[in-house]
Amino acid sequence: MLVLSSSAPPVLEVCKDRVSSSFSTSSSSSSSAFSAVVFRRSFFTRFNSSLICCCSSKLKLMADTALPSSSSSTSASASYSAAAKSVEEENHEIPVKKEDDNQLLRSRTYRNVRSAEELISEIKRESEIGRLPKSVAYAMEGLFHYYRNAVLSSGISHADEIVLSNMSVMLDFVLLDIEDPFVFPPFHKAIREPADYYSFGQDYIRPLVDFGNSYVGNIAIFQEMEEKLKQGDNIILMSNHQSEADPAVIALLLEKTNSLIAENLIYIAGDRVITDPLCKPFSMGRNLLCVYSKKHMYDDPELVDVKKRANTRSLKELVLLLRGGSKIIWIAPSGGRDRPDAVTGEWYPGTFDFAALDNMRRLVEHAGRPGHIYPLALLCYDIMPPPAQVEKEIGEKRVMSFHGVGVSVEPEINYNDVSLGCKNDEEAKSVYGQALYNSVNEQYNVLKAAIHGKQGSGASTPTTSLSQPWAS
């Protein structure tokens, strides 16, 4: 397991051996070039980004000891400024070591495979010679079969070539990281060059999405949000969380009309997605605020203090980013992925943690920038459903399928408007949280009727207008 430190974190440096690999996609005949790279660690220099996404259990854990009560706005502002100043001082530029003496060249095991049989054979060989842990090799082989079956079921042309190309690069990235594990700093910026991990993740998930049966709700509001971001405002998206593919799904559905949002989201990532060997390459392609989840904080008692210090640093990063303005934050106030009802098997948005939601609201209020909170719904569990139960061990089984997906947003919900008439802060917190959850749940049901109920855009309601912006 990788452990995040509260000291100055390492950063990815790139050197040597640029190798291109062409990718086919289900929606275009164009290909994307990826470079095989050699990684080496060094001290990081300060970098910036614009958009953030997080899960509430992690946010609450970070914020509980840092946020004041709503009646202590003066001390809140002081604490806020102090935290931001601390981050600025800690992240001063540090000279980095030259890479001229690094002569290590990595073998690209999978880049030249020509068939599924050859790829599986290479996985087995790597395991036999000890370069690949047996558990990872087993997971790789299983993932390949699930992915291949899902893409083949889509009926897209050149499906076998797409599968082989995407899986070859993905498995090379996995092997590369096993040889020299990448350690995520508290704030990780997506790796876009010379190897474009973001585009790799998009191209990998793209063939799993049935765009003919996928929808965006209220595309005009996404346009409105981009305008607010350009004005320096902060935006919060209170959302449900369906699968590990959520980031790619959001970006795929918005990439044509809202590339600002699609390409620059930052996600708060627990230790699961930054330590699981099969998940790390996808995480490396996203902007992440790395924290330890409350659910797994006490898995190893000896690491509790280290994890808490890492979370404190991540909170400081969040404070500084918000203070800079023009940030959009995706947060899942349920604290984790949605799960089906144990009796009916029906999926629905997980219940929101109102305290975590309120922590985020107050962070935004004290940022010194205008802030707007929107309810957002996601439906995409079919393409990569989570395990039925929350698992303690790293390395969950990943089942995949080709299916329609959806994302929808409704107009912002103002705290002061909704809480008007409430007798106290606790009642206001509950009323506001419930209003956001109800909106997410209603939008989810519209997406469900359109995608699962096969009603298409006919499932639109007066408050949720469905469209397919990529088709226009």
Swiss-Prot record:
Sequence motif: HXXXXD motif, positions: 241-246
Main location: plastid
Its EC number(s): 2.3.1.15
GO terms (BP aspect): CDP-diacylglycerol biosynthetic process; phosphatidylglycerol biosynthetic process
Localization of this protein: Plastid, Chloroplast stroma
Keyword presence, Nucleotide-binding: no
SMART domains the record matches: PlsC
UniProt keyword annotations, A-Z: Acyltransferase, Chloroplast, Lipid biosynthesis, Lipid metabolism, Phospholipid biosynthesis, Phospholipid metabolism, Plastid, Transferase, Transit peptide
Top-level enzyme category: transferase
Single GO MF descriptor: glycerol-3-phosphate O-acyltransferase activity
Recorded catalytic activity of this chain's protein: sn-glycerol 3-phosphate + an acyl-CoA = a 1-acyl-sn-glycero-3-phosphate + CoA
Any one cellular-component term (Gene Ontology): chloroplast stroma
Biochemical pathway: Phospholipid metabolism; CDP-diacylglycerol biosynthesis; CDP-diacylglycerol from sn-glycerol 3-phosphate: step 1/3
Transit peptide: 1-102
The keyword Plastid is assigned to this record: yes
InterPro entries for this protein: G3P_O-acylTrfase_chlp, G3P_O-acylTrfase_N, GPAT_N_sf, Plipid/glycerol_acylTrfase
Family: Belongs to the GPAT/DAPAT family.
PANTHER family: GLYCEROL-3-PHOSPHATE ACYLTRANSFERASE, CHLOROPLASTIC (PTHR35695:SF1)
Protein task: Esterifies acyl-group from acyl-ACP to the sn-1 position of glycerol-3-phosphate. The enzyme from chilling-resistant plants discriminates against non-fluid palmitic acid and selects oleic acid whereas the enzyme from sensitive plants accepts both fatty acids. This is an oleate-selective acyltransferase.
Comment field on protein domains: The HXXXXD motif is essential for acyltransferase activity and may constitute the binding site for the phosphate moiety of the glycerol-3-phosphate.
Protein's recorded name: Glycerol-3-phosphate acyltransferase, chloroplastic
Organism field: Spinacia oleracea
Record lineage: Eukaryota, Viridiplantae, Streptophyta, Embryophyta, Tracheophyta
Gene that encodes the chain: GAT
